[in-house]
């Protein structure tokens, strides 16, 4: 007897009990090992065939995946025909068991098609065992059917999903990833489903955020929906808000993002402009290019003045979104004029904003009505890009001037801080004039937090100071805030400065 033949027939022990199997082709036509396999898994196979939904398919999957993962099946005859999407797909039993859906369909078909299902399975497995070609008899092909109603599943995407049963690293194209995800969900092919999620998370952009988020909601994939929310928190204002894709952002996703304390914006007024543009695009669906800010303002101004936009039937459903905005953080005179000009907000909202501003100005900037830094702070932001080595911006609130600054020390080291500036030290007198009034107060109590976020390998890194209470003077060192120092390879870096002026 040849060594090859001897090796094929020799059994070896498997596990700590008296279970034996052929070492070369485990569980393929080896009826003793097949029987022992199910005994080891405590599976009543006859009962499992009567109730396939109760069977822990993953237990059998593990055996098939380990033993047939890289097996060359190109020359092997298919033993399962899957009828789906108007096509007949030829499959092989070991690969089929990677899909829980197909495995259950197979077992149901096995139960319905024969009086002795276990014997039928044994014959199918025996047909796979290595024999001389002339000794092989063709195995009976099992036919199973799968009906798919998900519109995301295309024939190309489904073919890609089935190909992944055989080859683990099949490339998933961006244009097909939604269909492959849907196919993996229907097939209950968990490994492929996770691969699709990973691809989608790394390919979030203005053109994909809407479809990827809705897919995450549809298939209850929290990892994907959370990734979409975090991505939009950073990119709503600086990126999506500059493109026509803003129109597609779902209202529920927008609401979540607006409530998030991590939301990045250059200023409260810039966030308002983004939201007004979103509403404009919802109502003017034929427009395919981003309009100017003046066009948007003129549109809202065109409604009759007897009723503001949010009090109209068309605006009632949008109130929750605009209640998330921090209108009290809009302090520049010309921006406040815009609030009234567009006739968008109820008069009571505008009166409250005006009253709070007057109170703060009369009391040296004190923001008595603001308590919670996470939900009420005035926010300003810097977007630190690859080309920046030093980047700063001047901001002013109630006559107090601050410079928010970012510095790059080397390829991965950065620091960020804010510093109070005398109005007489401003580089341009126009800045003082634009932000009037001017406070002559020597010290200003500020409660603030500096936060920096960057995307690295599909995951967000977040760096932040504590919530700090500090009196800002006009000379060093009291004029300078705590410095946030970070190490990251992520670019760009989204830096937020949030603060309130407590009573002092």
Curated annotation (Swiss-Prot):
The record's section on PANTHER family has: BTB/POZ DOMAIN-CONTAINING PROTEIN 16 (PTHR46843), BTB_POZ DOMAIN-CONTAINING PROTEIN 16 (PTHR46843:SF1)
What organism does this protein naturally occur in? Macaca fascicularis
List each copy of the BTB domain by range: 148-204
Q: Name one Pfam family in it.
A: BTB_BTBDG
Query: What name has this protein been given in UniProt?
Result: BTB/POZ domain-containing protein 16
Report the superkingdom from the record. Answer: Eukaryota
- The membrane-spanning stretches of this chain are none
């Amino acid at each position: 007897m040849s060594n090859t033949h001897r090796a094929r027939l020799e059994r070896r022990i498997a596990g700590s009990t008296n279970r034996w199997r052929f070492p070369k082709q485990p569980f393929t036509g080896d009826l003793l090992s097949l029987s022992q396999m199910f005994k080891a898994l405590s599976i009543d196979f006859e009962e499992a065939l009567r109730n396939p939904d109760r069977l822990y398919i993953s237990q059998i999957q593990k055996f098939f995946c380990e033993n047939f993962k890289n097996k060359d099946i190109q020359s092997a005859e298919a033993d399962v025909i899957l009828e789906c999407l108007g096509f007949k797909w030829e499959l092989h039993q070991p690969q089929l068991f990677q899909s829980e859906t197909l495995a259950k369909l197979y077992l149901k078909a096995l139960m319905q098609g024969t009086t002795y299902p276990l014997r039928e399975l044994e014959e199918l497995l025996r047909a796979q065992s290595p024999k001389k070609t002339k000794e092989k008899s063709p195995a009976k092909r099992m036919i199973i059917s799968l009906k798919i109603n998900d519109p995301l599943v295309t024939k190309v995407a489904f073919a890609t999903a089935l190909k992944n049963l055989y080859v683990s690293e099949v490339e998933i194209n961006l244009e097909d990833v939604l269909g492959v995800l849907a196919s993996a969900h229907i097939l209950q092919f968990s490994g492929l489903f996770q691969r699709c999620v990973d691809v989608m998370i790394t390919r979030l952009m203005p053109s994909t955020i809407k479809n990827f988020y809705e897919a995450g909601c549809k298939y209850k994939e929290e990892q994907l929906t959370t990734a979409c929310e975090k991505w939009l928190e950073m990119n709503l204002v600086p990126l999506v808000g500059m493109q026509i894709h803003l129109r597609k952002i779902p209202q529920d996703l927008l609401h979540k993002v607006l409530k998030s304390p991590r939301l990045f914006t250059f200023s409260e007024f810039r966030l308002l402009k983004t939201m007004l543009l979103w509403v404009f695009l919802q109502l003017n669906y034929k427009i395919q290019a981003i309009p100017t800010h003046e066009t948007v303002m003129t549109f809202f101004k065109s409604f009759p003045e007897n009723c503001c936009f949010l009090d109209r039937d068309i605006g009632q459903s949008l109130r929750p979104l605009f209640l998330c905005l921090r209108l009290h953080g809009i302090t520049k005179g010309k921006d406040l004029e815009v609030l009234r000009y567009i006739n968008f907000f109820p008069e009571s909202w505008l009166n409250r904003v005006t009253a709070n501003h007057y109170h703060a100005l009369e009391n040296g900037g004190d923001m008595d009505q603001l308590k919670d830094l996470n939900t009420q702070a005035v926010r300003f932001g810097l977007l630190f890009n690859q080309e920046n080595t030093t980047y700063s911006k001047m901001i002013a609130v109630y006559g107090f001037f601050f410079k928010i600054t970012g510095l790059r020390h080397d390829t991965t080291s950065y620091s960020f801080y804010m510093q109070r500036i005398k109005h007489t030290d401003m580089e341009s007198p126009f800045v003082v004039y634009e932000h009037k009034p001017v406070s002559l107060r020597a010290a200003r109590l500020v409660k603030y937090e500096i936060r920096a976020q960057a995307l690295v390998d599909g995951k967000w890194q977040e760096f932040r100071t504590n919530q700090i209470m500090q009196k800002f003077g006009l000379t060093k060192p009291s004029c300078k805030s705590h410095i946030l120092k970070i190490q990251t390879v992520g670019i760009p870096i989204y830096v937020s400065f949030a603060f309130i002026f407590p009573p002092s």
